[in-house]
Amino acid sequence: MRFAGCYVALATPFGRSGGIDEAALRRLVRSHLRAGTAGLVACGSTGEAATLTHEEYRRVLALTIAESRGLLPVIAGIGTSATAKTVEMAREAESLGADALLVLAPYYNKPTQDGLYQHFRAVSRNTRLPVIVYNIPGRTAVNILPRTLLRIAADCPNVAAVKEASGSLDQVSEIVAGAAQGFAVLSGDDSLTVPMMAVGAAGVVSVVANVAPKETAAMCAAALAGDFKKARRLHRALFPLVKALFVETNPIPVKAALEMMGLCGGAPRLPLTALTAANRGLLRRELAARGLL
């Protein structure tokens, strides 16, 4: 499986009762089927996976797979601070029909670089699915260094990509330079997609694509084609929206945006809170300026 282009990090809609809004989730998935989106990431950070019960996780993943109807690959977000539990999640996601796994680095317990290597090796050996390593030190408190990632990729044939959200172009450049042909680097920061693709990344796992899928996909397509003049133009056009969608902790703003657009409602689950009134005004103005309301 080749990873390239724009993958959307799907939000998880909640209804007024606080449960999963299944109809809204189906609408959200359908909005991507012909928008140029390369694939769907379910139950990741943007999908509030940390707040889902086990049954909710299964239901969100199963609904996403069913509604995509085989038209787009579905990547299941998995990952805990325990390797054995993460292996269980990998097996479960595979049994539900996921096409690939986005595996979060262990959080809270701050493993060493060798511990990270052993963790990802154990997960990859217990699934036949392609694995995307998810490096997001701002949330996990541990950075997967380039040498560690390259060691993982070299020793684990089904580790096919990394979602790199360290914010470091130096780190991305080291990975691109050292990785085998076919290994993909995907941006984990919407604001850095074009800069990362300029040094060899293959695409993005995008929050912004929830609300502007066609534009985000077009930006990635231009960069992949080597048309960085067009990619920069699209980046500049999207950048104010990107800033607005990260004015508070993700996914608070994107869930508010989806509600304003009528795609789905429901505030995030505690401990995240609804977008503040001042920031709702800022976000609404930005969406209106782009013709999204």
Predicted regions and their residues:
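Short helix-capping segments at alpha-helix termini
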Residues: 66-72, 96-97, 127-129, 154-158, ...
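Short, amphipathic alpha-helical "lid/cap" segments that border enzyme active or binding sites
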Residues: 22, 26-29, 146, 280, ...
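Catalytic alpha/beta core domains of metabolic enzymes, predominantly
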Residues: 125, 139-246
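Alpha-helix N-capping/helix-start residues
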Residues: 16, 22, 54, 146, ...
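Glycine-rich phosphate-binding "P-loop"
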Residues: 135-136, 158, 269-270
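C-terminal alpha-helical cap/extension of soluble enzyme domains
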Residues: 2, 7-13, 35-37, 198-201, ...
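A general structural signal for well-ordered alpha-helical segments in protein cores
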Residues: 25, 57, 61, 86, ...
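Active-site beta->alpha loop and helix N-cap motifs at the rims of alpha/beta catalytic domains
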Residues: 1-8, 12-141, 151
